[in-house]
């Protein structure tokens, strides 16, 4: 009706029907029970065998409890929008670009205001779809819309006519009390009468980072996916992405090292993007090491580093080095079953030995940018949130 693109999808009430729907859409697909919170029992499945396992182990499907099956947009950038609508006008509080790609639960992904890599054309699509959806739903108050961008095209994943968990972050980032505005709209005020008609345009960069509880969960693998695992959030603000991201990681107690050793063990799908990350880390003076496959790949692209044994090949390996406090950062994105077992042990050891760790390539790219900025001698801005808001107010008066 609105002409807003969304990923192809369907639902199933039996295993046979689920396989038929998935084949029609094409793997990989995102599967979940028909009503879940926090991504509970949500999973990305890559083939028919994986789907059969999910149907048997993860959910009980029936006519009363169907499962939803959607096309999974691989390598897409996920976007969150928080807005207020009074059934006539719509004000966008902020467009948030997720650091992690689509596939990591929105509650577990770091995100940035304003977006750093989305084109003006994509942002215009996001604004257009937000207004169309909010007005068509006759929303009176807050609405949160999740979208994904792939190849310059924006898809709407879901629209929730309610407050979202990002409202406190957005309000602090842009200096506008969205919940208060929405409450006044609900009781009859218009956005125009309240003086809020324009989308805020902050000059500073705000990063939301999550707090993960794995240090309280012995043995749990700290890997991110469609099921939400975080239990809190922190925020970093500065005048560029690098410093804001560094502050956010500092607040999350995942302090990015400016000296020392970095261990790399990356799945094949991520290796193309790894080259630039490795070059930035090496140029920043960090010493790199990794497993044989990663080391050989980077050597072909002019980045040379030390080889460390895989965990299943025996000692000395990276876990031994963490135990001796010889590793300052772990970057690990596993894929195969053996690598997954090794990766799980490495990530768990990083939590246990309190070594900063990264499990997605997008977070590695962000971390490399932050380290590069800090190594250039950039000073962290020490300023209250009120001072950032005052600067925005003064700019808007001009």
From Swiss-Prot:
It is an enzyme of class 6 (ligase). The gene is carB. ATP binds at residues 32, 71, 73, 78, 103-106, 146, 158. This is Carbamoyl phosphate synthase large chain. Residues 254-395 form the MGS-like domain. Mg(2+) 1 binds at residues 146, 158. The keyword Nucleotide-binding applies. Large subunit of the glutamine-dependent carbamoyl phosphate synthetase (CPSase). CPSase catalyzes the formation of carbamoyl phosphate from the ammonia moiety of glutamine, carbonate, and phosphate donated by ATP, constituting the first step of 2 biosynthetic pathways, one leading to arginine and/or urea and the other to pyrimidine nucleotides.
